[in-house]
Curated annotation (Swiss-Prot):
Taxonomy, superkingdom: Eukaryota
Biased composition annotated in UniProt, kind: Low complexity: 74-88
GN (gene name): Sgs3
Sequence ranges of Basic residues compositional bias: 89-277
Organism (species): Drosophila erecta
GO cellular component: extracellular region
Signal peptide range: 1-23
Biological-process GO terms, alphabetical: puparial adhesion
Biased composition (Pro residues): 60-73
UniProt protein name: Salivary glue protein Sgs-3
Amino acid sequence: MKLTIATALVGILLIACAHVANGSDCGCPKRTTPKPCTTARPTCAPVTTTTCRPPTTTRCPPPTTTRCPPPTRPAECTATTKRPTARPTTKRATTRRTTVRATTKRATTRRTTKRATTRRTTVRATTKRATTRRTTTKRAPTRRATTKRATTRRNPTRRTTTRRAPTKRATTKRATTRRNPTKRKTTRRTTVRATKTTKRATTKRAPTKRATTKRAPTKRATTKRAPTKRATTKRAPTKRATTKRAPTKRATTKRAPTKRATTKRAPTKRATTKRATARPTSKPCGCKPCGPGGEPCQGCAKRDALCQDLNNILRNLERKVRQCVCGEPQWLL
């Protein structure tokens, strides 16, 4: 908003300065020049020349002594602009050429490709459940009878305080016994260490007897309180109003069994590819098929150790199977 107001004020100032410079506010009005005649040659008629009227010159009246009021805007505009003296000027007729250019618009072709949109509409069977309304019965508010208890105030009981006489304790001074200092002998250590025992003189302290003062038994004044009887108020039994509720019957709506559309799927056949088993081209090392009456096996040096291990495993399994008896704590031979 501030920018627009500032630009408007600047524009008004510029227009006022331009009017003062040209003298349009106080001088002659602008002269109007007549438009030139246009001659057009017809195609069939003879050529005719048309003459235009000479331009008429209009003279301005002598300048009057009317002065413009001084401008209220900054003094820079008024100081630099001078009013020109009005002189009669004759303007020549100016002919303007108008050239019309042929504008060719290019035809713009827009390609509109509409895609076929397929919408799937699935209609689902909606079953509305019947709304069951429950009847609510409002209970009448039950007021309870309030009974006020009688408050009994107790009489304040004053206690008698007895001050005890201060008892002075007899102080007995203990006899201090000084111990004789024992001199220790320093022995130089040799390869064999000699150990000497020093006996310390022990002084027995005399038992100190403390003076015992017997205190006189202090008797406290006992005041018997009168038994306070409390007023007992029997409350009347409050009977509550019992309202029997009518059994509410719920509307049972039987739903129609909904049948689901079962679509049978066509059995899909899987392409079965038979794997080609590569048969060994080299003859295996070993014996011919086992059985009685066959040829004896000469053995295979490459597989002897493996065959022996397998035979040992089979023998151990057979032995464990024979030892196993259900329910026995140990293996049986």
